[in-house]
């Protein structure tokens, strides 16, 4: 018989840097999960990734207080900022441009995000990432 699911907890945690402080501690503490066990498992799973990169994670908490978790790819905006070498997007993306990004970089990001995105093909995913880039005030170059 399958375990009974008590809750799903969605968080963004820095890769390799999970610790019991907020937001991890309070979110998991409410569900009665062993926080240190999650932190150790998460840090072990993300140690191959760049430290500090925010990683979305969905934690499934079961009625017996055990848990499983699934890590996703970093948000597109974070990958775009890293590729363009900027700290933050534009407050007025239609007027103020903050950086430039090439189509090759967009395609690379789309391939990284492919596992978590829904799209017919890599071109459709690239166009989706391109829209995110434009809304951040990045200029897309061919």
Swiss-Prot record:
Pfam families attached to this UniProt entry: Ribosomal_L11 (PF00298), Ribosomal_L11_N (PF03946)
PTM notes: One or more lysine residues are methylated.
GO biological process terms held by the UniProt record: translation
SUPFAM superfamilies given in the database record: Ribosomal L11/L12e N-terminal domain, Ribosomal protein L11, C-terminal domain
Family: Belongs to the universal ribosomal protein uL11 family.
PANTHER family: 60S RIBOSOMAL PROTEIN L12 (PTHR11661), LARGE RIBOSOMAL SUBUNIT PROTEIN UL11M (PTHR11661:SF1)
Protein name: Large ribosomal subunit protein uL11
Name of encoding gene: rplK
């Amino acid at each position: 018989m399958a375990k009974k699911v008590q809750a799903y907890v969605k968080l963004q945690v820095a890769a390799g840097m999970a610790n019991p402080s907020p937001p991890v501690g309070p979110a998991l503490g409410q569900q009665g999960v062993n926080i240190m066990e999650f932190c150790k498992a998460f840090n072990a799973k993300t140690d191959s990734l760049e430290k500090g990169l925010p990683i979305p994670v969905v934690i499934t908490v079961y009625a017996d207080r055990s848990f499983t978790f699934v890590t996703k790819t970093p948000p597109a905006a974070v990958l775009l900022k890293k590729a363009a070498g900027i700290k933050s997007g534009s407050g007025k993306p239609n007027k103020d441009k903050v950086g430039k990004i090439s189509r090759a970089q967009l395609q690379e990001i789309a391939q990284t995000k492919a596992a978590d995105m829904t799209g017919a093909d890599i071109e459709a995913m690239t166009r989706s990432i391109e829209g995110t880039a434009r809304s951040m005030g990045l200029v897309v170059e061919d």
